[in-house]
A protein has these predicted regions:
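Gly/Ser/Thr-rich active-site loops/lids in small-molecule metabolic enzymes
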Residues: 126, 204-206, 256-275, 340-349
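N-terminal small/polar loop signature for handling phosphorylated ligands or for N-terminal nucleophile
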Residues: 37, 49-112, 193-251
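Proline/glycine-rich low-complexity loops and linkers
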Residues: 132-163, 168, 253-323, 329-331
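Gly/Ser/Thr-enriched, mixed-charge loops and adjacent short helices
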Residues: 113-233
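Phosphate-binding and adjacent anionic-ligand microenvironments
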Residues: 275-459
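Glycine-rich phosphate-binding loop
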Residues: 100-112, 232-252, 256-257, 300-302, ...
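An N-terminal, well-structured beta->alpha segment
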Residues: 1-69, 73-74, 152-178
Length: 459
């Protein structure tokens, strides 16, 4: 019995479903064919073909095979590189001016799977492009042409090519001891080798690819990194990657998880000495990004939440750096796409120049009181509530703040800021607050929590 197509598997930046329930080989074949049809239009950048790679999940290889079948039926070429981290697949596409398709469900648990698309510059597809593919699949339009070919290339060759490229851009000064936790995910075939070839002393754990993720979940949440926390005490730092290797967690020798802003602060303290360009950060990122950018007289451009927005802005603005608070980063000096393996390597190289422990460096960084609160509300009403609050703030007569409404509503005060935005994935609204003092944080929390609760009660 054929699986009924569920359009909800298409999200803003990728495709995700439960294998055998909402996504299978037949659906993936249709997605591959629809991708090829979109590639025939003027709405998609012209590319010579599509690089196809996949993560370690048991369903990933058969889903990739189905995608390639649909793609080649549409008359397009596929370059198959097999099981690699996401970075290696996108790297192969960028080097060859191909689009890229990567079969993964990233940090989700093993029963999930899906696909991510990237253009020849390594920029992930936006919602508009993904939804066009969805609509072609939904209309059950299946294109059959001739001329689409497949070619296999060794994933080891791609990984070697990637490592040589990154090492040509940056190398460490001193050989720090680093613990690398790959979580039995896709990063295990690349990250430890990159660090070792650069001369770092590496203690790697959970490097064997295993789609059952037997040692920890593919999402590197702090509570799940017990082995890394145990080992990091005898090293300089620890690094953990998610299932496809596109997000990272960094940890100091005390077992403390670094925030994305702290990782960015380390990187920017060195990067902005040499690289021109602005810094891109989403509206949720803290003032720490502004502080380090100001030291180098650089502008910070705020963008909506979503790593695809980050990459698009970095590419269009020729930025020096991009950061997304969910743990995505971009350093075009290394590669022009979102890549946590290259990012973690660059950060380690910067730290290798310091005589201080990582915990000392972190403790010297500026830090401000910060809080995130979630308010449950009707999924159908959440965007309307945020819109009402936005209008209320805009109509404030004694306005002592600056408003940014590109994604929800952010109000910047002289000594703090708040952000109110509806969740894209659940029935809730998030209130994010940062202030220069606990007293100011408390005042902002009281004022805007009460405002939100009042608007939710009006539903």
């Amino acid at each position: 019995m054929l699986m009924k197509f569920d359009p909800s598997i298409f999200r803003a930046y990728d495709v995700r479903g439960i294998y055998g329930k909402t996504i299978d080989e037949e659906i993936m074949k249709k997605i591959g064919n629809a991708f090829g049809q979109l590639a025939d239009t003027a709405e998609m950048p012209e590319a010579s073909g599509c690089v196809v790679g996949w993560d370690v999940r048991g369903s990933s290889a058969p889903l990739a095979e189905a995608f390639v079948e649909g793609l080649t039926y549409s008359g397009h070429n596929a370059l198959i590189i097999g099981q690699t981290p996401l970075a290696a697949t996108v790297f192969a596409g960028w080097k060859r001016k191909f689009n890229s398709a990567y079969i993964t469900a990233s940090h989700l648990t093993k029963e999930w799977n899906g696909i991510k698309f990237f253009d020849e510059n390594g920029v992930g597809f936006m919602q508009e492009e993904n939804f066009k593919i969805r609509d072609i699949v939904g209309k059950n339009i299946y294109d059959k042409k001739s001329g689409g070919n497949t070619k296999n290339i060794s994933n080891k060759d791609i990984i070697t090519e990637y490592i040589e490229h990154v090492l040509s851009r940056v190398k460490p000064r001193n050989k720090l001891k680093i613990i690398i936790d790959c979580g039995n995910g896709a990063a295990g075939s690349l990250a430890p080798e990159l660090f070792k070839k650069a001369g770092f002393e590496v203690d790697d754990i959970f490097t064997e690819p295993d789609g059952d993720f037997p040692n920890r979940l593919p999402d590197p949440a702090e509570d799940d990194l017990t082995e890394l926390k145990k080992r990091v005490k005898n090293s300089y730092m620890g690094i953990a990657y998610d299932g496809d290797g596109d997000r990272l967690v960094a940890m100091d020798e005390k077992g403390r998880k670094l925030t994305p802003e702290q990782i960015s602060y380390i990187i920017l303290s060195e990067l902005l000495k040499k690289e021109k360009g602005i810094v891109v950060a989403n509206v949720e990122c803290t003032k720490m990004i502004d502080d380090i950018a100001k030291k180098f007289s650089r502008k910070v451009e705020r963008i909506p939440v979503g790593h695809t927005y980050m990459m698009q802005a970095v590419h269009e603005e020729k930025a020096a750096f991009g950061v997304e608070r969910s743990g995505h980063y971009s350093i075009p000096l290394l590669v022009p796409f979102d890549d946590s393996i290259a990012i973690s390597f660059y950060a380690a190289c910067v730290l290798s120049k310091s005589s201080k422990r990582l915990s000392e460096i972190v403790d010297e960084m500026p830090a401000y009181p910060f809080i995130r609160l979630n308010f449950e509300c009707d999924d159908r009403e959440k965007f309307k509530i945020v819109e009402r609050i936005k209008q209320k703030l805009k109509n404030e007569k004694s306005q002592n703040f600056k408003i940014n409404d590109m994604d929800g509503v952010r109000a910047d005060f002289e000594n703090g800021w708040i952000l109110i935005r509806a969740s894209n994935t659940g029935p809730s609204i998030r209130l994010t607050i940062e202030a220069e003092s606990e007293e100011k944080l408390g005042k902002l929390k009281k004022e805007f929590s009460e405002m939100l609760e009042e608007e939710i009660r009006k539903m």
